[in-house]
Amino acid sequence: MKNFDRQYRLSAGKAGSTGFEIGGGKRPLHVSFSVEKADTNSQNTAKVTIWNLSDEHLAELSKNDCVVVLHAGYGDTRPLIFTGVVTFATTKADGADRATEIELVDNRIEVRDTYVSVSYAGAVNCKTLIQDTADQMGVTVSFSYNAEFKDIPNGYSYVGPARNVLTKACETSGLTWSINNGVLQVKKPGDTMSREVYELSAETGLLGLPERVQISNEDKGYSYGWDVEYLMNAAIGLDDYVYLNSKMVKGDFRVYSVRIEGDNMEGSWSCTARLLEVKQK
C-alpha cells in the first residue's frame, strides 16, 4: 500500500461562522497531529501543531469554543480524523518559523453545557429516552446493529446533565455509550457497531508484527487482543470489526482504542490500534 501523497484538510471556526481551511494547494502548511480515541465514555483528545499560520487564522483559533475538523489520508481519500473544540492554544518561535500548538477535546461543548429535561408519564423505552436526549444535546445518535432496549416502567422524569440520562438508559438496557467525532454511539459492551469487516494485512497496510496484550476490565476480568500498527487509515474507527491477517495471528477483533499520528512533511503517517476479542453473546 502506498505511503506517499499525504494529504490533509483542517478547518477551524466557531459553529455557524465562516472560519478558515488549510491543507489544499501545491504548498500546504506544515502540520503534525496526534489523536487518541478509546471505547469509553470519557472524551477523546487530540494535539495539533501548525506552522506559520496567518494572524487572521490565529485570531480565529483564539475565539471561545472554536471547533477544529481534521481530515487526513492519501490523495483524494481523506477520512475524518477528529472533530473537537480548542481547549488550549499557544504560538512560539521555531527557528525562523512560528509553531502553533493546539489541544482539542471531542464534543466538549455538548458534554459540558447540555442540561436536558425529560418527562414521561407511563412506561418509556430506553431507545426513546436516548434519542430524545441526543436531540436536546444536538448530536446525531447511532445504535449498533444488535442493540436491544428495555422499558423503564412507571414513568421517568429528570432535569440535569445529559450524560446522567444516557448512563441510566444504557445501564438499564445493558448497553454502553460514547461520543466520537460528534456522533453518540450506543452498543453492547465489548461488541462492535456494525457487521462490516476491515481486513488488516501486509497488503492493506499492516506494519511490523502484532503484539499480544491483556488488559484488566475492573470487575469484569481480563480482555485479550493485539496491538497493531498500520498505514494511515482513519476509515477504521472505534468499535469496528477488523479481520487481522498476519503470520502470527488470524481472526476477527474489534477496535478498542486507536492512536493516529501524522506529519505531512516527514515522520509518521500511521495508526496504532488495540484490537480485542469480540465477546460472543
Question: At which residue positions do the language-model features occur?
Answer:
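Assembly/oligomerization scaffold segments
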Residues: 1-103, 225, 266-268, 281
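An acidic/polar, Gly/Ser/Thr-rich interaction patch typically located in mid-to-C-terminal regions
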Residues: 33-57, 61, 189-281
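Sec-dependent N-terminal signal peptides of Gram-negative outer-membrane/periplasmic proteins
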Residues: 55-57, 73-74, 95, 112, ...
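Extended Gly/Ser/Thr-rich low-complexity repeat segments
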Residues: 58-68, 112-120, 239-245
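Short beta-strand-centered interaction patches in the first periplasmic/extracellular domains
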Residues: 97-109, 140-217
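Second-shell loop/turn segments in exported
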Residues: 114-123, 152-156
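Polar, S/T/G-rich
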Residues: 123-131, 135-136, 158-172, 236-237
